């Protein structure tokens, strides 16, 4: 699949880092530049109803050859995470034979002691960074895999298929990917995001997510005359965070365990803000975490009545499991497609969110499929080419199997 590798290496040269501080959609001009290039490519491929709107949402259709088959969607996002993403220079480690991988010309290393799963890829071709940027496999690998699968279906009209809708979204990494998704021009019965990790991942559960800002307002007085009058908001914030459960943080949890994560803090004597993210798979656990924060704020306010402590909670997205379970055939079809591609399905929860989570609540059930990548959002990101090829085969098999499904 030379075209797959060529596509991916071309796509990662586009600088598409999203910008959470910019309220515009898309939040960065590079995403529109990439979207226009993809739009041209899809038109040249011969897809129908190729549409790129002012917000950077790109949709197209591969018409089916089975009139009664359900229409499905394949979705990926164009932006990359909040990490250095300009001037990406991939390196290809052909026929990996084990051991550490030097990244570029510096001292950065993809070390086997840190990533023991590297041993699973002996003899394969690994695409890595040069140690100075992320790679962008999240989610340009998904885009390359989708379009390569579409290429294969175009070249093999004997493969039965219903309509296949393709959607590429902006700003997924900053939680806005579904904000303006054009469902009116995306008439799929259900869809799949191709935005997962290692080979075989199949996900239809994700975190419930919220953000919490705790604002501490104190009283700044000259420190030489501060006795009895200064209220140092930073001290209060430190007390607050020190009382948070250390066993319920991202670095101490996995699987179905939720957490509180102090993502950012800034402050002065007068005013300090702590910005947390709250994650839990269980609805009751999610509600309990938010209640726990409220109780902690109220308790500290009683201890420091001369200060003012304010809590703002904002829900971000919800666990899509409740929206997928009434349509479990779409998960079973994905499992069968992986097995047909000689891939072992690995059903696991997403310790994060995807566009598909919100789209599922908008009426488009949307589980998540693997891309094959590892270590997303940083300089140690890499992806095995053979896993990408398996993703393409899985998508082709998914289209074929879905063409025979009648609900």
UniProtKB/Swiss-Prot annotation:
Pfam families: M20_dimer, Peptidase_M20. Its cofactor is Zn(2+). Keywords: Aminopeptidase, Cytoplasm, Hydrolase, Metal-binding, Metalloprotease, Protease, Zinc. It is an enzyme of class 3 (hydrolase). InterPro entries: ArgE/DapE_CS (IPR001261), Bact_exopeptidase_dim_dom (IPR036264), Peptidase_M20 (IPR002933), Peptidase_M20_dimer (IPR011650), Peptidase_M20B (IPR010161). It is found in: Cytoplasm. GO terms for molecular function: metallopeptidase activity; tripeptide aminopeptidase activity; zinc ion binding. Cleaves the N-terminal amino acid of tripeptides. This is Peptidase T. It comes from Aeromonas hydrophila subsp. hydrophila (strain ATCC 7966 / DSM 30187 / BCRC 13018 / CCUG 14551 / JCM 1027 / KCTC 2358 / NCIMB 9240 / NCTC 8049).
């Amino acid at each position: 699949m030379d075209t797959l590798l060529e596509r991916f290496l071309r796509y990662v040269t586009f600088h598409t880092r999203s910008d959470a501080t910019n309220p515009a959609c898309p939040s960065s001009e590079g995403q529109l530049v990439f979207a226009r290039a993809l739009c041209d490519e899809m038109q040249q491929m011969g897809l129908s109803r190729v549409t790129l709107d002012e917000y950077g949402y790109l949709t197209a259709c591969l018409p089916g050859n089975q009139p009664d088959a359900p229409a499905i969607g394949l979705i990926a996002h164009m932006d990359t995470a909040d990490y250095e993403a300009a001037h990406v220079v991939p390196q290809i480690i052909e026929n990996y034979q084990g051991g550490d991988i030097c990244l570029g010309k510096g001292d950065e290393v993809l070390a086997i002691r840190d990533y023991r799963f590297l041993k699973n890829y002996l003899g394969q071709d690994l695409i890595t960074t040069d140690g100075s940027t992320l790679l962008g496999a999240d989610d340009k690998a998904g885009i390359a895999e989708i379009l390569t699968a579409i290429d294969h279906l175009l070249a093999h009209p004997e493969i039965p298929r219903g309509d296949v809708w393709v959607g590429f979204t902006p700003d997924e990494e900053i939680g806005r990917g579904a904000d303006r998704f054009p469902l009116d021009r995306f008439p799929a019965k259900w869809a799949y995001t191709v935005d997962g990790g290692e080979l075989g991942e199949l996900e239809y559960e994700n975190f419930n997510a919220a953000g919490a800002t705790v604002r501490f307002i104190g009283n700044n007085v000259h420190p030489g005359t501060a006795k009895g009058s200064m209220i140092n908001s930073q001290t209060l914030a430190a007390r607050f965070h020190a009382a948070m459960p250390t066993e319920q943080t991202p670095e101490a949890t996995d699987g179905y365990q939720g957490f509180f994560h102090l993502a950012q803090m800034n402050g002065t004597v007068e005013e300090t803000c702590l910005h947390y993210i709250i994650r839990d798979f269980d609805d009751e656990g999610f509600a309990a975490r938010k209640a726990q924060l409220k109780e902690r704020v109220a308790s500290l306010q009683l201890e420091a009545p001369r200060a003012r402590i304010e809590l703002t909670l904002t829900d971000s997205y919800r666990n899509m499991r409740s929206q997928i379970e009434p349509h479990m055939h779409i998960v079973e079809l994905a499992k069968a497609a992986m097995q047909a591609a000689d891939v072992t399905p690995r059903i696991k929860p997403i310790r994060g969110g995807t566009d598909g989570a919100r789209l599922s609540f908008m009426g488009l059930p949307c589980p998540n499929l693997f891309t094959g990548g590892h270590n997303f959002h940083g300089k140690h990101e890499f992806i095995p080419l053979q896993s990408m090829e398996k993703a393409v085969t899985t998508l082709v098999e998914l289209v074929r199997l879905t063409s025979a499904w009648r609900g």
